[in-house]
Curated annotation (Swiss-Prot):
Cell membrane keyword on record: yes
The protein's name in its UniProt record: Uncharacterized PPE family protein PPE21
Family: Belongs to the mycobacterial PPE family.
Localisation per UniProt entry: Cell membrane
Manganese among keywords: no
SUPFAM superfamilies with a match to the protein in the record: PE/PPE dimer-like
Length: 678
């Protein structure tokens, strides 16, 4: 990692976050105790065998025993010395960390510096703060340099500590175990039918079991120094990650404090991208949730540099704008200052045209309100449109204020409304219901995606809050066709049913791998928990095709589990290929591709959940009317195509109990409707 390119906000946060030196001090103490125990055992064992050999036990058997015992005593003595060295190096690592921590700028000081800069910039109307701004920036550069020096020093000392460690010498009995592995904790390599319980690691210094790597306190990791389980990578504190330095679970990437992220350094869950503070973002540098784009401050925006929610475009400040550089709500166009304007360059509310100053003008370059035409100054009717009830409406058939669209019930809308039983405020979308929506046919608040039901969704046909992926049911999902919370997988095939999955087609939670049934799996097609290998049935397996626990070897079989018809299945009684779970059936019409299901009793391809029929479904009891074909459904008990939510029948739908096509909301029976009971 190149620490010199990371600002002090990141370097300081990385140093001050986490458990500190406590775990390493505990490890040093444990290694010291182990060294003492091994030394005592070596001395005691040598004394006992010497007394036997020089006493009553004589002959060839005694001589053979003496040779074996001497070899074992030497190994105990060597292991004691190596444990003592490990304790010393752990203490050296603690000293290196404490020195680096003392040299690192506190995050509070960095935050105060940036806050001071923002204050100076905001009040620098005449340039009077230029010297102070330069001074603040100079201090910030010093902070940057101090953090870089601390991190580089820490990296150098920690690397030296790691290089000086000597791998543990295998015990004299290691040659009798598979692959020369060292059996720890007294586990033999048991064989119970097709169930194996492996108790060994394929490297040294592990406290857990079934690891392919070194110095893992956890189990079933492929990598080194993982405190959690089933990680593929190094130095993960959580479980089920593919990557390194993750604090949460189910991430694909590095340095994520949250869970279910695909990317780097996301402070939140379910993001696809990097440096997001929030959840369910599809992009980078977002401070908020459910955004599609970069550097947004808020939720449900599609675009970049927006402050607010539900905007489609760039650099908007407000809600529900379609366009760029708008300050206000529900504007369609660019550079409007106000709300409900249909056009560009307006200052005011409800103007239908461009470059107007005032309210409810129909035309261009007007100053006033209620004017019809261009280049006028003055006051016209209360409403410049027809069939309006209210004030400042330039559209037609509105009930309310400052609407430039038609048939709205509400205020400040530039899009066209749905009609009775739907209320719109600050929306620029066609036929949407709610507040601040720029997505067509949406129901809720701040949706920039079309046909969405909920709050701050930036993708189409989603039901829930802060979803930036398409056809999700739940919260903070940036992937596609997920049912749950914080899932970033599924963009190429099907999403997952569960929580914080960055892989696709999982039934469970915190899976960075794909097509798993269970939790915290970083491998693929596993049924169980904490597996970093592939096609395993069980727990803590880092090898492939194992049925059991703590296995780090690859088995020469076609399936793991029991009673399968096909190949590469895990679990129980699956038919087809690449299924995990129980009683799933993957049709072979696309056999040249990787097909399969996770969960229980699914029929089709790429399904995650329970009793789904069709292709590309997640959730519970979803289906397509023709039994076969791609459905793209998430949620519960839906039938049709491209649906999220609950109890819907049709296509392109979100919400609850809708019956027809292109619908969002609740209990609607008409097509192209949003809201309630149309």
């Amino acid at each position: 990692m190149n620490f010199s390119v990371l600002p002090p906000e990141i370097n300081s946060a990385l140093m001050f976050a986490g458990a500190g030196p406590g775990p390493m001090l505990a490890a040093a103490s444990a290694w010291t105790g182990l060294a003492g125990d091994l030394g005592s055992a070596a001395a005691s064992f040598s004394a006992v065998t010497s007394q036997l050999a020089t006493g009553s036990w004589q002959g060839p058997a005694s001589a053979a025993m003496t040779g074996v015992a001497a070899s074992y005593a030497r190994w105990l003595t060597t292991a004691a010395a190596q444990a003592e060295q490990a304790a010393g190096q752990a203490q050296a690592a603690v000293s290196a960390f404490e020195a680096a921590l003392a040299a690192t700028v506190h995050p509070g000081a960095v935050s105060a510096n940036r806050g001071r800069l923002r204050s100076l910039v905001a009040s620098n109307l005449l340039g009077q703060n230029a010297p102070a701004i330069a001074a603040v920036e100079a201090v910030y550069e010093q902070m940057w340099a101090a953090d870089v020096a601390a991190m580089l020093g820490y990296h150098g000392e920690a690397s030296a500590v790691a290089l000086s460690l000597t791998p543990f010498t295998p015990s004299p009995s290691a040659a009798a175990t598979p692959g020369g592995a060292v059996i720890i904790a007294g586990f033999p390599f048991l064989d119970l039918g097709n169930v194996t319980i492996g108790g060994f690691n394929l490297a040294s210094g592990n406290l857990g079991l079934g690891n392919l790597g070194s110095f893992n306190p956890g189990s079933a990791n492929t990598g080194s120094v993982n405190l959690g389980n089933a990680n593929i990578g190094d130095l993960n504190l959580g479980s089920g990650n593919i990557g390194s330095y993750n604090l949460g679970g189910g991430n694909t990437g590095d340095l994520n404090p949250g869970s279910g992220n695909t990317g780097t350094l996301n402070w939140g869950s379910g993001n696809i991208g990097s440096y997001n503070l929030g959840g369910g973002n599809l992009g980078s540098y977002n401070l908020g949730s459910g955004n599609t784009g970069d550097t947004n401050f808020g939720g449900g925006n599609t675009g970049n540099l927006n402050v607010g929610g539900g905007n489609t475009g760039n650099s908007n400040f407000g809600f529900g704008n379609t366009g760029n550089v708008n300050f206000g709500n529900g504007n369609t166009g660019d550079t409007n200052f106000g709300s409900g304007n249909l056009g560009s360059g307006n200052i005011g509310f409800g103007n239908k045209g461009s470059h107007n100053i005032g309210f409810g003008n129909s035309g261009n370059n007007n100053i006033g309100f209620g004017l019809t035409g261009d280049n006028q100054i003055g006051f016209g009717a209360l409403n410049s449109g027809s069939g309006n009830l209210g004030f400042g409406n330039s559209g037609n058939g509105n009930i309310g204020f400052f609407n430039s669209g038609n048939n709205n019930i509400g205020m400040g809308n530039s899009g066209n409304g749905v009609g009775a039983l739907s209320v719109e405020f600050g929306s620029s979308a066609e036929r949407s219901s709610g507040f601040g929506n720029s997505g067509e046919l949406s129901t809720g608040i701040g949706n920039s995606g079309q046909l969405s039901t909920g709050w701050f969704n930036s993708a189409t046909t989603s039901t829930g809050w802060f979803n930036s992926g398409t056809t999700n049911t739940g919260w903070f999902n940036s992937g596609t066709t997920n049912t749950g919370i914080g899932n970033s997988g599924g963009n190429l095939v099907t999403g997952s049913m569960g929580l914080f999955n960055s892989g696709h087609t999982n039934t469970g939670s915190f899976n960075a791998g794909s097509m798993n049934t269970g939790d915290f799996n970083s491998g693929n097609v596993n049924t169980g928990y904490f597996n970093s290998g592939n096609i395993n049935t069980g727990f803590f397996n880092s090898g492939d095709l194992n049925t059991g626990l703590f296995n780090s070897v690859n088995q020469p079989v076609q399936n793991s589990g029991w009673l399968h018809t096909g190949t590469n299945n895990s679990g129980y009684a699956n038919a087809g290929t690449f299924n995990s779970g129980f009683d799933n059936n993957a049709r072979d019409e696309h056999a040249e591709f990787v097909t399969g299901n996770s969960g229980l009793a699914n029929v089709g391809n790429y399904n995650a959940g329970i009793i789904n029929v069709g292709d590309h479904l997640s959730g519970f009891r979803n289906s397509v009317p023709t039994i076969t074909g791609t459905a793209n459904i998430s949620g519960f008990v839906n039938a049709g195509t491209s649906i999220s939510g609950f109890f819907n029948f049709g296509s392109l739908m979100s919400g609850f109990a809708n019956f027809d096509d292109e619908v969002s909301g609740y209990l609607n029976g008409d097509s192209r409707a949003s809201g309630w009971i149309h």
